[in-house]
């Protein structure tokens, strides 16, 4: 880890050689088309950007904290209270004052004036304590006097504990005979805010007050019980991994472990310290999270795997760096669980219990922590995690209230589109937003600055930088070019197979392709995308044929043709519509089977035909039930309805085309069928909830109407829908658990992910309206396929 001496230096200089993941080399297919000098230059820039990002995995840079360095500079020698223990820190302060008299970091944000005031006053106190730097002290005092009004300015971001620490430092300044000419009204306002903050803390429970006061120990003066503070000392000797708090503790108690921590920090960083140390696990997880959320993780698979393995080892060892920090714990839990590691949710539940234990909001005053905990609390896999479920609902309500009242303004990151980010987290749960859609939103909401605020501001290129953004934008747009060409190919396929001549069928090629491109977006997975999209079009056509377009004779004829397979369509099709549909089916199945044969090394034709026959049989059964006006039991209905929802032909053939070998034993395994049933059941129930009233008017059955009927008509529609939603929730969580599970799994993870991807598709499609009728989808389709991201718009 090294320190960044400038807040603006988020990205280091270019370097000649770097470790780039070889595991993802094949994923550049279709992207490196350097057919002109301009394209060659773009390709070179692309690789250089990847190289700089790869370098972040081998170091963790943090910005210097002048505030913390000042408090460390105040530490007296253990052998003489008249001498500084760390004169190098004192020299650093003397050499790093700004031209305006402050000790601000270069290019500091205009909303960080309170931070600058606090840091500057701390530096003045350090110099005055040791009787050095009279010129710097006078310039610093002049800066504080000129900018003192900012200490109570409402539009400024207030660092943690500022309302207590800053007045305490002013008292210290008076005790050191520093002559500060301060505006009386502002000073009175500051004292009033300090008293208000102390009163608020005293009204919280004793444990919360104690930990908060311990964290801002340097500002508590005679109110501080230093022995109680030391309960929070960590194994590395620090208090909260915070140099300023630890320095104040050593000054008060001469604790040797505190001193050892400070010495180790300075051995690591030289003559200045960061605001938090160590931060290695969090920094590395932030890098991984940035890459995953922006859609560029596939370029760094080896590096990411190394971080995940190391984080998991630290998790199992109970590392304080993870479990003593809410943000790190939540991020580690979410990242590990979503990558298939077996981690318990107990630490997240404990954090949430502490957050909601009283009116003192503790961790939830910081937007980073709040969002991390919320995202982590969504990842419920097991029935016994019900407590986490309840806390998630409460946290969602809290976020909604804070959003409506602009409660995050004081705690947000600088330059961050916080409203959009929080709104996205609330409106689009992780299970109801398609992968590429989420990536685009994350890119659009991305904040290059990514300054964090504790008692002072701090930054790291691992938290965020322009390389993450530029690589993700370039990658998104390159993939989009490929996707647009594939959509044109799909539209040609529709015409070539005469599907456009079927007047009864909905024209949904763009939507079908969109669901493929938004979930299976990598360039080299073109065959899987096209299989998904073409079968999506065909299932829509067949669904409309069974629903409104075909007679019973035509439906039976279509099924018979698929059963026989090798037929003369000119003589054995009973109508032009049947001929068009069967011909398109056969041509597409054979095309997909040929591609699958090349990847799998065995014939998959019979299996794909079987998948289609299962769908046709289930649709025919529904037709016959409608004709007979008979009402099955709920179990009878669902045993057929999950198949007739028609996800089988879309998802199952595509499994053969995503890369891994899929043996006959695998596709006959119970895991394969369970994944399919869970995914399809979610889709069927979502569809039946949204279409309940329409189906009721048309005299058709649905899961909702049958549930009411099977319960003697004694429950309300609302109660029936509530039961359906609970069913969906159970199956969705079980599906995710099986997708993420690796130890007992038979299917390759790349194949299992497709079941989850489709689950997110149906959750999005049925969010508001009934399936394809959602007006929101039109804009989303354009954003994913047609509209490039323009970097200079950010």
Swiss-Prot record:
UniProt-listed Gene3D superfamilies: 1.50.10.160, Farnesyl Diphosphate Synthase, Terpene synthase, N-terminal domain
Additional comment: Abietane diterpenoids (e.g. miltiradiene, abietatriene and ferruginol) accumulate specifically in the periderm of roots. The ent-kaurene diterpenoid oridonin, main constituent of Isodon rubescens, accumulates in leaves.
Gene, per the UniProt record: KSL5
Residues given in the record as Mg(2+) 3 binding sites: 687, 695
Name of protein: Ent-kaurene synthase 5, chloroplastic
GO function term, MF aspect, one: magnesium ion binding
Positions annotated to bind Mg(2+) 1: 543, 547
Binding annotation for Mg(2+) 2: 543, 547
Cofactor: how and how many bound: Binds 3 Mg(2+) ions per subunit.
Pathway info: Secondary metabolite biosynthesis; terpenoid biosynthesis; Plant hormone biosynthesis; gibberellin biosynthesis
């Amino acid at each position: 880890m090294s320190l960044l001496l400038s807040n603006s230096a988020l990205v280091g200089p270019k370097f000649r050689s770097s470790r780039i993941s070889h595991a993802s080399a094949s994923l550049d297919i279709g992207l490196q088309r350097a057919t002109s000098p301009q394209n060659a230059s773009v390709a070179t820039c692309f690789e250089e950007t990847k190289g700089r990002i790869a370098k972040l995995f081998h170091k963790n840079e943090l910005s210097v904290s002048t505030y913390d360095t000042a408090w460390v500079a105040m530490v007296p020698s253990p052998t003489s209270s008249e001498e500084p223990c760390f004169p190098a820190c004192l020299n650093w302060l003397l050499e790093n004052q700004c031209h305006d008299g402050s000790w601000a970091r270069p290019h500091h944000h205009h909303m960080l004036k309170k931070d600058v005031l606090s840091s500057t006053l701390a530096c003045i106190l350090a110099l005055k304590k040791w009787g050095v730097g009279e010129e710097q002290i006078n310039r610093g005092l002049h800066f504080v006097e000129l900018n003192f009004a900012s200490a109570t300015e409402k539009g400024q971001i207030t660092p943690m504990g500022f309302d207590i620490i800053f007045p305490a430092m002013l008292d210290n300044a008076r005790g050191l005979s520093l002559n500060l000419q301060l505006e009386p009204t502002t000073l009175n306002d500051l004292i009033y805010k300090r008293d208000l903050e102390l009163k608020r803390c005293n009204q919280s429970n004793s444990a919360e007050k104690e930990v908060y006061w311990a964290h801002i120990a340097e500002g508590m003066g005679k109110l501080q019980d230093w022995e109680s503070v030391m309960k929070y000392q960590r194994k590395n000797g620090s208090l909260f991994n915070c140099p300023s708090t630890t320095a104040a503790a050593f000054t008060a108690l001469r604790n040797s472990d505190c001193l050892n921590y400070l010495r180790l920090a300075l051995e690591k960083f030289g003559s200045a310290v960061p605001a938090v140390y160590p931060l290695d696990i969090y920094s590395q997880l932030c890098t991984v999270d940035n890459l995953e959320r922006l859609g560029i993780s596939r370029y760094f698979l080896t590096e990411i795997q190394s971080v995940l393995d190391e984080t998991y080892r630290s998790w199992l060892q109970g590392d304080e760096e993870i479990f003593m920090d809410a943000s790190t714990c939540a991020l580690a839990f979410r990242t590990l669980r979503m990558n298939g590691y077996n981690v318990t949710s107990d630490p997240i539940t404990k954090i949430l219990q502490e957050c909601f234990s009283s009116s003192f909001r503790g961790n939830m005053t910081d937007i980073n922590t709040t969002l991390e905990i919320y995202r982590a609390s969504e990842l419920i896999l097991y029935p016994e995690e019900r407590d986490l479920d309840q806390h998630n609902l409460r946290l969602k309500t809290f976020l909604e209230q804070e959003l409506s009242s602009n409660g995050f303004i004081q705690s947000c990151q600088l330059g961050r589109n916080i409203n959009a980010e929080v709104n996205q987290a609330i409106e689009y749960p992780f299970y109801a937003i398609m992968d590429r859609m989420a990536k685009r939103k994350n890119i659009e909401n991305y904040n290059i600055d990514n300054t964090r605020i504790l008692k002072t501001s701090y930054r790291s290129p691992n938290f965020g930088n322009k390389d993450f953004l530029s690589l993700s934008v370039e990658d998104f747009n390159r993939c989009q070019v490929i996707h647009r060409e594939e959509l044109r190919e799909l539209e040609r396929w529709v015409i070539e197979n005469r599907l456009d001549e079927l007047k009864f069928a909905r024209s949904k090629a763009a939507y079908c392709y969109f669901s493929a491109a938004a979930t299976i977006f990598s360039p080299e997975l073109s065959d899987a995308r096209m299989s998904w999209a073409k079968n999506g079009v065909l299932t829509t056509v067949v669904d409309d044929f069974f629903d409104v377009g075909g007679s019973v004779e035509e439906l039976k004829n279509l099924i018979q043709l698929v059963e026989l397979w090798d037929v003369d369509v000119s003589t054995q099709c009973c109508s032009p519509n049947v001929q068009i549909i069967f011909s398109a089916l056969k041509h597409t199945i054979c095309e997909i089977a040929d591609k699958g044969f090349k990847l799998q090394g065995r014939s998959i034709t019979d299996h794909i035909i079987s998948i289609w026959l299962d769908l046709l049989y289930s649709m025919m059964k529904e037709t016959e039930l409608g004709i007979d006006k008979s009402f099955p039991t709920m179990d009878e209905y669902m045993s057929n309805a999950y198949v007739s929802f028609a996800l089988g032909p879309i998802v199952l053939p595509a499994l053969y085309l995503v890369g891994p070998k899929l043996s006959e034993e695998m596709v006959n395994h119970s895991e394969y069928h369970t994944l399919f049933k869970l995914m399809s059941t979610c889709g069927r129930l979502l569809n039946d909830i949204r279409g309940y009233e329409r189906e009721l008017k048309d005299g058709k059955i649905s899961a909702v109407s049958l549930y009411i009927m099977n319960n003697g008509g004694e429950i309300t529609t609302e109660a029936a829908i509530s039961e359906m939603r609970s069913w969906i929730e159970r199956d969705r969580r079980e599906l995710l658990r099986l997708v993420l599970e690796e130890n007992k799994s038979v299917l390759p993870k790349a194949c299992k992910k497709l079941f989850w991807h489709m689950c997110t598709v149906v959750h999005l499609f049925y969010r508001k309206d009934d399936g394809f009728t959602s007006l929101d989808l039109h804009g989303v389709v354009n954003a994913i396929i047609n509209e490039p991201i323009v970097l200079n718009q950010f």
